[in-house]
């Protein structure tokens, strides 16, 4: 997916959401509302233009995804982010999408972010504390954990929604096992050439897979491999 407009052309979060609506990436009021509520600028490091439709580096060879990719994933998962549901964000990075999930599932649900770089967990916690999702982290319905995302987070499983923010060569089995029957996972799969795959698990535990788009994500890998060139 290519970016939709030139760098530096937008200065407000609401303007970003409006552009995403105009280009058909944000298609529902539910996704528009949460993206308007969680200001992307709070999750992008200083010195970068937060409302540009481009991924941004957040340190440690990690990025915050482009806004159109956040919108795409939220639209794909919105029916699995109803109040009271459980959501897992693998490779939570800046914490932006985990905060969006938390706002959608609400205080009766659970939104869990998994990140294997401890410094990013600290940063994402600080980001959320400045955002509209701060109260949800305080009451425990939103949490971040230092762990290998490929292993998921069994403590809050099963999950209605699982999002993976880095590309895996194949779908990690622990994530499939932690996906609730009737739930959905969105994950980029591949090495250089990647597809954003949508995995739906039926009530009997069988799964169906479809490709939604060709994408380019950083790899889902070990902490040591990620930090090797940082």
Swiss-Prot record:
Tissue specificity as recorded in UniProt: Highest contents in seeds.
PROSITE patterns named among the record's database cross-references: PCMT (PS01279)
GO cellular component, one term: cytoplasm
Active-site residues annotated for this sequence: 65
Family to which the UniProt record says this protein belongs: Belongs to the methyltransferase superfamily. L-isoaspartyl/D-aspartyl protein methyltransferase family.
Example of a GO MF term: protein-L-isoaspartate (D-aspartate) O-methyltransferase activity
Enzyme type, top EC level: transferase
Catalytic activity annotation: [protein]-L-isoaspartate + S-adenosyl-L-methionine = [protein]-L-isoaspartate alpha-methyl ester + S-adenosyl-L-homocysteine
Role summary: Catalyzes the methyl esterification of L-isoaspartyl residues in peptides and proteins that result from spontaneous decomposition of normal L-aspartyl and L-asparaginyl residues. It plays a role in the repair and/or degradation of damaged proteins. This enzyme does not act on D-aspartyl residues.
EC number: 2.1.1.77
Alphabetical list of CDD domains matching this protein: AdoMet_MTases
Subunit structure comment from the entry: Monomer.
Source organism (scientific name): Triticum aestivum
Record bears the keyword S-adenosyl-L-methionine: yes
Highest taxon, organism lineage: Eukaryota
Name the record gives this protein: Protein-L-isoaspartate O-methyltransferase
Keywords: Cytoplasm, Methyltransferase, S-adenosyl-L-methionine, Transferase
Subcellular location: Cytoplasm
GO biological process per UniProt: methylation; protein modification process
Coiled-coil annotated residue ranges, if any: none
